[in-house]
Amino acid sequence: MGDTSSLAPSAWPWLVFIAAVLAPFAMSSGGINIAILTMLFIYLSVAWNIVGGIAGQFCIGHSLFLAAGAYTSTLLSLHFGVTPWIGMFAGAAVAAVIGVLIAWLSFRYTLPPLSFALVTLALAMLGYLAISSIDLFGASRGLTLPVRGTPATYQFGADVWYYVVIALHAIGAVALSAWLYHTKVGLYLRALRDNERAAHAIGVPVLRYKMLAMAISAALTALGGTF
């Protein structure tokens, strides 16, 4: 066996990346499905971490943003023929607006962390009840897209390509999160997480950056909803 100790540290992420992308091509159907779900949850975890980890705001209503992405892109595809590759960004915009509104209503009145968490959970449940009751959203039946089997409609002939798509989503989310962490925005968000009063005292616009964190996290989550 070769000596891997001579590999530069910077080479390891690339090796892991190549292995992660190529591995499913040698897996069984069941293994690919597990890999797809694993990558999806990695992606959603990174999306949640922007508001819950970096900014320190414990939101447990991200299923609402996931639904916003899924239903927006699906409705646009069913009624207007918009490809999900475009509809997913419309869903991200809708989720970002919802996230900003939730953050504005919650943080403008300085809700404590536990109350904010419960508000987001309650709104997610209300969203579920609304979707389950409105015919436009398919009510309890849900919505069904016609099977076209073309990449342009976000449908692929082999499951492995779904893995490739969600793996690229996850890699992009990790890269975005890592970049954001080291920017001025990331510095402000960490300041809010560590000591909100001190951050406010030195001039950090608390409400604005909490809303921004919520918007970014919601938009990324919605992209996963389209998937």
What does each model-identified segment do?
Residues 1-227:
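Transmembrane alpha-helices and adjacent helix-loop boundaries
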